[in-house]
Amino acid sequence: MITDQNSKPQQGELPTTHIDALTNSFSQFLRIEATSGAVLLLATVVALTLSNSPWSDGFRSLWETPIGIQIGAFQFLRSLRDLINDGLMTLFFFIVALEIKREVVLGELRNPRMVAFSVVAAAGGMLVPMGLYLALQHGQPGQHGWGVVMPTDTAFVIGCLALLGSRVPPGLRVFLLSLAVVDDLAAILVVAVGYSRSIDWTALALGAVGLVIIRGMALLGVRNIRVYFLAGAIIWLAVNASGIHATIVGVILGLMTPTAGWVSDQRLGEILRKVLSYPPGDHWSGDTEDNRALQVAGIAVRETLSPVERLEAMLHPWVAFGVMPLFALANAGVSITIKGLINPVSLAVMAGFVLGKPIGVTAFAWLGVRTGVAIRPAGLTWGGLVGGALLTGIGFTMALFIAGQAFQDATLNAAKLGILAASVVSSVAGLTLLCMFPKRDQTLDADFH
């Protein structure tokens, strides 16, 4: 390693190297949540461009490429698209579950009435669009796609808020994140229950046994994350064979992840004081007492963080900048035609997102506050909430995912067009309204009271 001799880190900081100038900037880039929305948008544009170009047939065929393994009588063969949708997306759902667990135990969702505000608003944002969709598609071939209009895309919503900067009303970001988390959890359950095949109970029982084993390993104090990932992969195979959509495994494992660190802050302090008690010098190598103490300190520092925090920090960049763009490339490609846009399924999807979402979120949130069931977050005006409610019409990722489970061929193409069109309209409408209203809109607040 080449160290920058001219660089003098401040006391308590790590020494710097020449490569840090590049890697630190890149790490900061990955930490910006809004950036993932921009990358996702870029992948979507690429998919749409290639799907409507002379290379469209080759682009679509790429995602149907069969990939798998065979060991004796065991054979696992899936298309590249299925591996992304069923396999890699499990990591996405795992991250979503980690966020849910963290928010409920450590974050904004600890306050029951604050939780109620997000849950009630999310319920309206799911029930009203679903009801509107079913009203338009009752008795039609697209009726089975009622789950498409339920979710909200967190990355795109946060990306939109980032464009507004300081104009975003206080509390709106937390509210939309909480609402999106509830939306995603409900959408995951819809996929698992509403869009699964006939169930193989033996395979499902094997998956349940695997979950019990993972719980047992946690109680015994097994700390190696690789062991849990291996066990999770085996459970995924069992649940996938059962007929239930295997992405539910990611949710269950995420919710099972502990939120407390193994090493307490007090114990960490004691271990570090022991390391610091040794005299300075080049004596930290070899099988010596001070070297062993240093290794223990390294483990203690890592284990002070909870598994939820460690896994989220480790996996989030891979999911945001790897899994999600791949998902968009594999699923957002759609042939843009006037016939597809005026298809009844496309129109029903657009109505559900563009009209149903904001109406449902706003109306249910208002009812929750009026009945005393929930409290509105401090600093969140009703004008800001309406603008945010319009942004919840950006369904994209989860909507495309559910559409892939509910539809095939031409109907799927129409549903994708509806999702994309609704996402564009909702983002423009939401951003416009949030720009029009100041942070504190007393007039609209008074009207709602």
From Swiss-Prot:
Pfam family, one: Na_H_antiport_1
A GO BP annotation: regulation of pH
Reaction equations catalysed: Na(+)(in) + 2 H(+)(out) = Na(+)(out) + 2 H(+)(in)
Keyword Transport assigned: yes
InterPro entries per UniProt: Na/H_antiporter_dom_sf (IPR023171), NhaA (IPR004670)
Single Gene Ontology MF annotation: sodium:proton antiporter activity
One of the record's GO cellular component terms: plasma membrane
Membrane disposition: Multi-pass membrane protein
Top-level division of the source organism's lineage: Bacteria
Keywords (A to Z) from UniProt: Antiport, Cell inner membrane, Cell membrane, Ion transport, Membrane, Plasmid, Sodium, Sodium transport, Transmembrane, Transmembrane helix, Transport
Annotated compartments: Cell inner membrane
Transmembrane regions: 32-52, 87-107, 114-134, 145-165, 174-194, 202-222, 233-253, 318-338, 347-367, 382-402, 417-437
First-listed, main subcellular location of the protein, grouped into a coarse class: membrane
NCBIfam families hit by this protein: NhaA (TIGR00773)
Function: Na(+)/H(+) antiporter that extrudes sodium in exchange for external protons.
Family: Belongs to the NhaA Na(+)/H(+) (TC 2.A.33) antiporter family.
Protein name as annotated: Na(+)/H(+) antiporter NhaA 1
Protein species of origin: Acidiphilium cryptum (strain JF-5)
